[in-house]
From Swiss-Prot:
This is D-fructose 1,6-bisphosphatase class 2/sedoheptulose 1,7-bisphosphatase. One of its GO terms (molecular function) is fructose 1,6-bisphosphate 1-phosphatase activity. Mn(2+) 2 binds at residues 97, 100, 225. Belongs to the FBPase class 2 family. Signal peptide: none annotated. Inhibited by AMP and slightly innibited by hydrogen peroxyde. Pathway: Carbohydrate biosynthesis; Calvin cycle. It comes from Synechococcus elongatus (strain ATCC 33912 / PCC 7942 / FACHB-805). It catalyses: beta-D-fructose 1,6-bisphosphate + H2O = beta-D-fructose 6-phosphate + phosphate; D-sedoheptulose 1,7-bisphosphate + H2O = D-sedoheptulose 7-phosphate + phosphate. Its cofactor is Mn(2+). PANTHER family: FRUCTOSE-1,6-BISPHOSPHATASE 1 CLASS 2-RELATED (PTHR30447:SF0), FRUCTOSE-1,6-BISPHOSPHATASE CLASS 2 (PTHR30447).
Length: 345
């Protein structure tokens, strides 16, 4: 899969990022998301595959494009599919977030990016549009920290695994009222907290790379983004755990479903019989081969944002593979017109 469509999925996230970046700082988050979705879908439909969106922009009746269950790729066309020799059709599941951190893009803040994860059919967990308690940590702490332990306990373990004093550790937490006690506990334990307004996929992935000064992600965020983060962390060999949150009282904000009971019923309809189960990266991204791709929209810890010049743009992308165990940073100059001078800055 990496050899057949690896480069093309980079182009998919690049096109989404360029489209969103044109609206960076204009305060139009919905429009930034819409153009990213459209650009991603157009390029995705040029890839020689039969893809199925398992995590996208919502249910079919809620989203016009990249909705859950939508087929994408050249072979979504039954006539073209019929001409493919037996056993040669590439069927994949796809999780997308065309503009991760729409507010970050809209207000020109760092950390917005276009992301997707792919695996063979059945290889990605079809997470409901609920919330998820998450714990991400570097590879050295894999299997040692645990989402069921307190933040204080996990910080002690992290300190030992990384051979760092606790006061040298940085934990990323989303700036939400629900995290007030978590933030207090982390600070009382001696670690430092980096609060983010949006974009916890970037924060989770940063835990997998040395030199980002990000040592853990803790707290509750969106479940679909949790699956995308898990796919990346599986490829990187990092630690990721997620637990679905179905009680509105826990997140102190709206959820699909009006009550704890209705949310449990919805999970059961989806075949999730144990709503309190803790999933690791291998369960959320269980496929034999998993690929993750991202392209910076605004500058972040890992990638530069889109930089426009007269007649073109420059992007920085990341593609991570579970099969080759590689993380490739791709620097691309896009020439829109007949450009006489190509900017390398």
């Amino acid at each position: 899969m990496e050899k057949t469509i690896g480069l093309e999925i980079i182009e998919v996230v690049e096109q989404a990022a360029i489209a969103s970046a044109r609206l960076m700082g204009k305060g139009e988050k919905n429009e930034a998301d819409r153009v990213a979705v459209e650009a991603m879908r157009v390029r995705m439909n040029q890839v020689e595959m039969l893809g199925r969106i398992v995590i996208g922009e919502g249910e079919r009746d809620e989203a016009p494009m990249l909705y859950i269950g939508e087929e994408v790729g050249i072979y979504r066309d039954a006539d073209k599919r019929a001409g493919v020799p037996a056993g040669k059709l590439v069927e994949i599941d796809i999780a997308v977030d065309p503009c991760e951190g729409t507010n970050l893009c809209a207000y020109g803040q760092p950390g917005s990016m276009a992301v997707l994860a792919i695996s063979e059919k059945g290889g990605l967990f079809a997470a409901p549009d609920f919330y998820m308690k998450k714990l991400a940590a570097p590879p050295a702490a894999k299997g040692k920290v645990d989402i069921n332990k307190s933040a204080t306990e996990n910080l002690k373990i992290l300190s030992e695994c990384l051979d760092r004093a606790i006061d040298e550790l940085v934990v990323v937490v989303m700036d939400r009222p629900r995290h007030k006690e978590l933030i207090q506990e982390i600070r009382q334990a001696g670690a430092r907290v980096r609060l983010i307004s949006d974009g916890d996929v970037s924060a989770a992935i940063s835990c997998g790379f040395a030199g980002t000064n990000t040592h853990a992600l803790m707290g509750i965020g969106a479940a679909p983004e949790g699956v995308i983060s898990a796919a990346a962390m599986r490829c990187l060999g990092g630690h990721f755990q997620g637990q679905l949150i179905y009680d509105p009282e826990v997140v102190k904000t709206g959820l699909i479903g009006e009550s704890r009971e209705s949310n449990i019923a919805r999970l059961q309809e989806m075949g999730i019989t144990d709503p309190d189960r803790v999933y690791d990266a291998n369960e959320l991204a269980s496929g034999q081969e998993v690929l993750f791709a991202a392209c910076g929209i605004t500058p972040g810890l890992l990638m530069e944002g889109v930089r426009f010049f007269k007649g073109g743009a420059r992007t920085q992308s990341l593609v991570i593979s579970s099969q080759s165990r590689t993380a490739r940073f791709v620097d691309t100059v896009h020439m829109f017109d007949d450009v006489k001078t190509v900017s390398l800055r």
